[in-house]
């Protein structure tokens, strides 16, 4: 990493690594999707959202710069977002990218992302990807604080460390925090009554952990190209011993059958409405839509021309 937390090569590697990982994890994540709507599409929706970020970066000429790459990542995710999980993830990615552009360290960027994702939902629910975002952010903060000054993210001295070394340290702290998140997944999910009754983990939390694992790999390898390893999903890797996105922890739940998903009735006759609206004078849009739908999320961003939009 040549500049701050995320430079252009790492942003590109992260987006593509997350896309590959979610593509491989999609069916397992879909299978445990019972909240907010039991429609078995969280894995698919988060994959499409991340694919939009990767496509936006592909459309950007190499060497466009860190700020342009981060803006493209955020905008691509926003405009491609599908479903409530995709909208929330797009807001998370946008807030993280924005914090990175502003020079934030890893703990600050993840805390900003967690707060931004929660703000996207008019009725935030604990026990979901929103809670997992906060758990990982806190674990990163605690992990960074435990590293001696100048030797880890979250401390002023890290800004003086050469970029690749700082990225390695950020990757190590994030990887450790993701271990905490995976270890807390059952407990976090059990905090939500629907998930507790269905005895499943939250699908959105699973997707977020996969996306952040891809970030840890991208940071650890500074955006270098990858080669796959059996049983894993390749991230941006240059050596056989380099880290991979591990999906073995994901639940192996059965696909929905008939009218039930993990024992929860599949919502009948549901209609999903997605819209990208120009303009920013819509401060009460989420509240007004909340009274009309089961799962509402509204995210603000900018279009390709820099104009304000809401999705």
Please annotate each region the language model reported.
Residues 1-311:
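N-terminal loops that bind phosphate or other acidic moieties
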């Amino acid at each position: 990493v040549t500049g701050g937390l995320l430079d252009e090569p790492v942003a590109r590697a992260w987006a593509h690594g997350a896309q590959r990982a979610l593509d491989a994890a999609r069916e397992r994540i879909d299978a445990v999707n019972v909240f907010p709507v039991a429609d078995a599409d969280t894995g698919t929706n988060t994959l499409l959202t991340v694919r939009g970020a990767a496509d936006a970066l592909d459309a950007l000429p190499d060497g466009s710069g860190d700020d342009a790459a981060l803006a493209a990542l955020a905008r691509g995710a926003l405009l491609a977002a599908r479903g409530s999980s995709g909208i929330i993830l797009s807001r998370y990615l946008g807030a993280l990218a924005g914090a990175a552009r502003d020079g934030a360290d890893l703990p600050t960027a993840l805390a900003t992302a967690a707060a931004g994702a929660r703000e996207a939902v008019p009725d935030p629910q604990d026990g979901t990807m929103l809670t997992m975002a906060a758990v990982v952010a806190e674990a990163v903060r605690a992990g960074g604080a435990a590293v001696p000054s100048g030797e880890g993210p979250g401390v002023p001295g890290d800004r003086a460390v050469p970029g690749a070394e700082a990225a390695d340290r950020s990757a190590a702290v994030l990887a450790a925090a993701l271990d905490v998140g995976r270890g807390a997944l059952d407990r976090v999910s059990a905090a939500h009554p629907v998930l507790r009754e269905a005895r499943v983990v939250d699908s959105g939390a699973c997707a977020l952990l996969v996306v952040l694992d891809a970030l840890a790999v991208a940071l650890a390898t500074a955006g270098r190209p990858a080669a796959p390893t059996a049983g894993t999903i390749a991230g941006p890797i240059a050596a056989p011993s380099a880290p991979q996105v591990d999906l073995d922890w994901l639940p192996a739940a059965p696909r929905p059958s008939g009218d039930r998903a993990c024992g929860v009735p599949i919502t009948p006759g549901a209609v999903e409405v997605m819209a990208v609206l120009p303009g920013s004078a819509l401060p009460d849009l989420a509240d007004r839509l909340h009274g009309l739908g089961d799962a509402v999320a509204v995210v603000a961003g900018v279009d390709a021309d820099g104009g304000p939009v809401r999705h």
